[in-house]
């Protein structure tokens, strides 16, 4: 049997419980065809880079699969039929990653407070008015210093 990583996107208007039900449904398809599903990750609702079938967001889910090719083909066939699945991608891998995926590690990183984030700054000019601007080069400081241009309708 071959090893696969499978990611699919589900519509934004279904609930997280319905996404879990989809994962269980496709897990059942794999197991019915002689395969095993290892790690399952639900990455949650994320914004899409571009609209897919009129959706701006989607629920992302990842499954590590150890199954024959026929089982994966059957799962993909059922995903093509389902209206709840926007996109899917299956990749053959040499071995499954241990621990959380890169997306889950990124989520853990994003949960921590950042040191260099935008916040109130000490010192500098961000906390007070900088005062009047210095005169511009050429002798004109503000709009009142400019010579009036003749208007064509006054002639």
Curated annotation (Swiss-Prot):
Gene3D superfamilies: 3.30.70.60
MF (Gene Ontology): small ribosomal subunit rRNA binding; structural constituent of ribosome
Spans annotated as Disordered: 94-155
Keyword presence, Calcium: no
One Gene Ontology biological process: translation
InterPro entries (UniProt xref): Ribosomal_bS6, Ribosomal_bS6_sf, Ribosomal_S6_plastid/chlpt, Transl_elong_EF1B/ribsomal_bS6
GO cellular component, one term: cytosolic small ribosomal subunit
CDD domains in the cross-refs: bS6
Cystine pairs: none
Keyword list, A-Z: Ribonucleoprotein, Ribosomal protein, RNA-binding, rRNA-binding
Record has NAD as a keyword: no
Source taxon at top rank: Bacteria
NCBIfam families: S6
PANTHER family in the record: MITOCHONDRIAL 28S RIBOSOMAL PROTEIN S6, SMALL RIBOSOMAL SUBUNIT PROTEIN BS6M
HAMAP family linked: Ribosomal_bS6 (MF_00360)
General function of this protein: Binds together with bS18 to 16S ribosomal RNA.
Family (UniProt): Belongs to the bacterial ribosomal protein bS6 family.
Listed name of the protein: Small ribosomal subunit protein bS6
Source species of the chain: Rhizobium leguminosarum bv. trifolii (strain WSM2304)
Gene: rpsF
